[in-house]
């Protein structure tokens, strides 16, 4: 088989295609969750924090003060931008929780489908098994 033929066989296997679809859908889903966090959850958090949330929280190393993280970075001052890290952790936690709920729901549906499926009918014994059963019964007598 040629190199291109091997690659085509590899790329068209079910697992690779499923993985590609999963990555694409996962990227789109990540954007949805990020929007949910940025546009719906963080405004509520900012009500209690009194500002725009965590993203712009930072600590400047030194005696200077800056009104925003962008201005501190522009000045080239070393900063400890802990707010962006906290925001990323919140995004990840919400994304992981939503995915967990989706997987849990899918597993529950799968269990219900398996429970609702009729039990398989036992197969008829083969002629060989019937003959062996008859021989066993004759030997017992």
Swiss-Prot record:
Any single Gene Ontology cellular-component annotation: plasma membrane
Entry keyword Nucleotide-binding: no
Keyword DNA-binding listed: no
Subcellular location: Cell inner membrane
Pfam families in alphabetical order: MscL (PF01741)
Residues that span the membrane, as ranges: 16-36, 83-103
PANTHER family assigned: LARGE-CONDUCTANCE MECHANOSENSITIVE CHANNEL (PTHR30266:SF2), MECHANOSENSITIVE CHANNEL MSCL (PTHR30266)
Homology family: Belongs to the MscL family.
Stated name of the protein: Large-conductance mechanosensitive channel
Organism: Cytophaga hutchinsonii (strain ATCC 33406 / DSM 1761 / CIP 103989 / NBRC 15051 / NCIMB 9469 / D465)
């Amino acid at each position: 088989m040629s190199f291109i033929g091997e690659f085509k066989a590899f790329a068209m296997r079910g697992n690779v295609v499923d993985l590609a679809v999963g990555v694409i859908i996962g990227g789109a889903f990540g954007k949805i969750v990020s929007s949910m966090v940025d546009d719906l959850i963080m405004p509520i958090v900012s009500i209690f924090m009194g500002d725009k949330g965590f993203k712009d929280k930072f600590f400047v190393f030194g005696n200077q003060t800056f009104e925003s993280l962008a201005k501190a970075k522009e000045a080239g001052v070393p900063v400890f931008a802990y707010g962006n890290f906290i925001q990323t952790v919140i995004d990840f936690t919400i994304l992981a929780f939503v995915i967990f709920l989706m997987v849990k729901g899918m597993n529950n549906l799968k269990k219900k489908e398996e429970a609702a499926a009729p039990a398989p009918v036992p197969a008829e014994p083969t002629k060989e098994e019937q003959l062996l059963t008859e021989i066993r019964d004759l030997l017992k007598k």
